[in-house]
Curated annotation (Swiss-Prot):
Identification of the protein by name: Riboflavin synthase
Disulfide bond sites: none
Originating organism: Haemophilus influenzae (strain ATCC 51907 / DSM 11121 / KW20 / Rd)
Pathway where it operates: Cofactor biosynthesis; riboflavin biosynthesis; riboflavin from 2-hydroxy-3-oxobutyl phosphate and 5-amino-6-(D-ribitylamino)uracil: step 2/2
Catalytic activity: 2 6,7-dimethyl-8-(1-D-ribityl)lumazine + H(+) = 5-amino-6-(D-ribitylamino)uracil + riboflavin
Source taxonomy: Bacteria, Pseudomonadati, Pseudomonadota, Gammaproteobacteria, Pasteurellales
Role this protein plays: Catalyzes the dismutation of two molecules of 6,7-dimethyl-8-ribityllumazine, resulting in the formation of riboflavin and 5-amino-6-(D-ribitylamino)uracil.
Length: 204
């Protein structure tokens, strides 16, 4: 499990294509590697990945074809950066909201509105079906970042970002047209699905 509080970004050092999967090697800072062991879980752009090898500051992950297909990790290149969050431990402060690291879909950045002290970013989701889980003032994870939804319109929603989030995460470098990973809030999904199933059972 993760909290959606990204610890920083890290560059892709190398990518090794193999039969039906890819090994992605990321260069992690010392504070990101503390007590790190093979088998540990680390979120890369919000995707829960398992550490397969540690070689100094280089940490390897294996990504299956399904992960490459449904997330933006399938398009990253050597030199690109990813958001990094270590798995939460017992007693960890949950500053965001609980995340599983299982991506629901991707979204495209449709607009970026900059102001003096923050930035509003709009996202276009692939279908209206996803929007039932996107509620104003609700939670959503974008590239592993726990964010509050500011406004919802048709198949779009926006978030408002403070300078700290822009500096610590990839959001400060994102451009219109970029693709981001979306994990919907599991509690919201459970409530919406339960109500929907109940209404269907009553023929509403």
């Amino acid at each position: 499990m993760f909290t959606g509080i990204v610890q920083g970004t890290a560059p892709i050092h190398s990518i090794k294509e193999k039969a039906n999967f890819r090994t992605q090697v990321v260069k992690l800072l010392p504070e990101m590697r503390k007590d790190l062991e093979i088998g540990a879980s680390i979120a890369n752009n919000g995707v829960c990945l398992t550490v397969t090898e540690i070689n100094g500051d280089l940490v390897s992950f294996d990504l299956m074809q399904e992960t490459l297909k449904i997330t933006n990790l399938g398009t990253v290149k050597v030199g690109d950066y990813v958001n990094i969050e270590r798995a939460m431990q017992m007693g960890t402060e949950i500053g965001g909201h609980l995340l599983s690291g299982h991506i629901y879909c991707t979204a495209k950045i449709s607009d970026i509105i900059a102001s003096e002290n923050n930035r509003q970013i709009w996202f276009e989701l692939p279908s209206a079906d996803v929007m039932k889980y996107i509620l104003t003032k609700g939670f959503v994870a974008v590239d592993g970042i726990s964010l509050t939804i500011g406004e919802v319109r048709d198949t779009q929603f926006c978030v408002n970002l403070i300078p700290e989030t822009l500096q610590r995460t990839l959001m400060g470098r994102r451009k219109v047209g970029d693709i981001v990973n979306i994990e919907i809030d599991p509690q919201t999904q459970a409530i919406v699905d339960t109500v929907e199933n109940y209404l269907q059972s009553k023929n509403f």
